[in-house]
């Protein structure tokens, strides 16, 4: 298969674990807390206190969903309570993340396998206000997908910032043992120019091909490369041994057979 294996896919599906991994790598992430649905049901005041310690606005996100489903922006206690009700309807674990005022979103994809990782150009989506909803991502322009969204490629940011984002993207790609194409999303605080890693998408819309095209990699070439990496991964898997002959295990198996007789 052409996409990530178990490790990258699992981390990419869990926003709470994902953020913990990014933090452990020393990457800049937005302040956050998390809770279980049962905590909110039993002691909403305690969860609210943790959220308000971050300071509004905050984003409330189901841990295991994508495409902005169940995500809400809370600017006060009333909207936070509403956001929690929405998120809890979708998941039992909820991420509560500090929000930025009018952040600049930057995305960067990466293509590779193993030690090989090629970062794409950076893009800046420009057709959003608070964040892209599910409909904005997939229903705009006749449902043609993410490639149809308005964006600036390359992103109009300093070269040093571009290189930093590309370096982070490659670092994340390798740490999570990714394969194929992934996309890592970032935010820049326009007030401080601080950069934050947001999340990784292990199966990005349209394979983020539009981020590689300006580099001279056509969609056909991208697909060919995905197939090649998938084959390379299979070859490497077949080179590994998955069986271990053990006298102890043999005796245990023989003993089990004797008992059955």
State the predicted function of each range:
Residues 75-152, 156-160, 167, 195:
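Phosphate-binding site of ATP-dependent enzymes
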Residues 1-2, 29, 58, 219:
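Hydrophobic beta-strand scaffold residues
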Residues 3-4, 67-68, 205-210:
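Short small-residue beta-strand/loop micro-motif enriched in glycine and branched aliphatics
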Residues 23-26, 156-261:
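ATP-dependent carboxylate activation and anion-phosphoryl transfer catalytic cores
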Residues 37, 125-127, 203-205:
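A short acidic/small-residue loop/turn micro-motif
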Residues 1-10:
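Short, acidic/small-residue loops that bind anionic groups at enzyme active sites
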Residues 10-97, 101-102:
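Active-site nucleotide/adenylate-binding loops and adjacent lid/helix of ATP-dependent enzymes
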């Amino acid at each position: 298969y052409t996409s990530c294996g178990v490790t990258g896919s699992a981390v990419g599906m869990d926003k709470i674990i994902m953020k913990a991994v990014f933090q452990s790598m020393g990457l800049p992430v937005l302040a956050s807390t998390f809770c279980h649905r049962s905590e909110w049901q039993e002691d909403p005041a305690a969860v609210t206190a943790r959220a308000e310690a971050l300071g509004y606005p905050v984003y409330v996100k189901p841990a295991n969903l994508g495409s902005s489903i169940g995500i809400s922006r809370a600017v006060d206690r009333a909207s936070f309570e509403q956001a929690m009700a929405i998120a809890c309807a979708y998941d039992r674990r909820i991420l509560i993340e500090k929000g930025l005022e009018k952040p600049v979103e930057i995305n960067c994809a990466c293509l590779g396998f193993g030690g090989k990782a090629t970062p794409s150009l950076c893009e800046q989506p420009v057709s959003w206000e608070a964040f892209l909803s599910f409909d904005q991502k997939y229903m705009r322009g006749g449902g043609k997908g993410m490639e149809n969204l308005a964006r600036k490629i390359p992103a109009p940011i300093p070269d040093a910032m571009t290189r930093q984002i590309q370096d982070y993207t490659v670092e994340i790609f390798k740490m999570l043992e990714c394969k194929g194409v992934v996309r890592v999303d970032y935010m820049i605080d326009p007030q401080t120019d601080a950069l934050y890693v947001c999340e990784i998408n292990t199966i990005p819309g349209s394979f983020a091909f539009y981020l590689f095209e300006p580099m001279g990699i056509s969609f056909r070439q991208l697909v060919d490369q995905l197939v090649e990496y998938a084959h390379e991964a299979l070859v490497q898997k077949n080179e590994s041994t998955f069986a271990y002959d053990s006298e102890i295990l043999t005796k245990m198996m023989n003993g089990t057979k004797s008992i059955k007789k």
